[in-house]
Amino acid sequence: MLAFLFYGLLLAACGSVTMSNPGESSFDLADRLDPVEKIDRLDLVEKIGDTHAKVLEIWMELGRRREVDAAEMHAICRVQPSATLPPDQPQITGLVLFRQLGPGSRLEAYFSLEGFPAEQNASNRAIHVHEFGDLSQGCDSTGPHYNPMEVPHPQHPGDFGNFVVRNGQLWRHRVGLTASLAGPHAILGRSVVVHAGEDDLGKGGNQASLQNGNAGRRLACCVVGTSSSAAWESQTKERKKRRRESECKTT
């Protein structure tokens, strides 16, 4: 495409001069031009060449940007019990994995956690993104919910909602999350916090409900960091395995 554009410009540069002989070459044509006109023509051709080079450079840069924009992004968060948590509280560990196909795509995540009280089967636990990645005082130093748009809970980008615990474990794949790994509101470097209670989803009738859903004590947390796709691919295989096992049980 760029080559055709350049060729067209070159033809336009020489279009006003006709060849007296059908077999005359472009070199013969250049010899027939008077010195001043020849200099003007050569200068024009040189400018066209410069323009072609600039257009080509812009085209290549756009291609590089498209590759970057289309790049799949992954992140990982290794959940550990809060350093300030009393020993009689559940010791939650596990992984939260994120994948985003591009800056404009919706985020998806795997949540794989264990250590919840087994006797509290089918209980709901809230998980949120908090503003800071500061774990110096355990999960207590992660700050409030990450809320860059200053909207009420549960519209914060990291309000992941409630997760059902079964047999002391939590495993869930969620898609269409409003949080992002790219852009000015990316959650990279921020924290994911697992709470002791259920999120009331802003329906608790008090100020705390509109801030944090009255989700209770911060049991465990982690800091979101970029990663390769390896952990995500492993969880995807685990998900397929779980589906097969579930299908076998229902047949």
UniProtKB/Swiss-Prot annotation:
A GO cellular-component term linked to this record: extracellular space
Cofactor binding remark: Binds 1 copper ion per subunit. Binds 1 zinc ion per subunit.
Name of the coding gene: Sod3
Signal peptide region: 1-15
Pfam families in the cross-refs: Sod_Cu (PF00080)
Stored InterPro entries: SOD-like_Cu/Zn_dom_sf, SOD_Cu/Zn_/chaperone, SOD_Cu/Zn_BS, SOD_Cu_Zn_dom
Subunit field text: Homotetramer. Directly interacts with ATP7A/MNK; this interaction is copper-dependent and is required for SOD3 activity.
Protein name, entry field: Extracellular superoxide dismutase [Cu-Zn]
Upper lineage: Eukaryota, Metazoa, Chordata, Craniata, Vertebrata
Species for this entry: Mus musculus
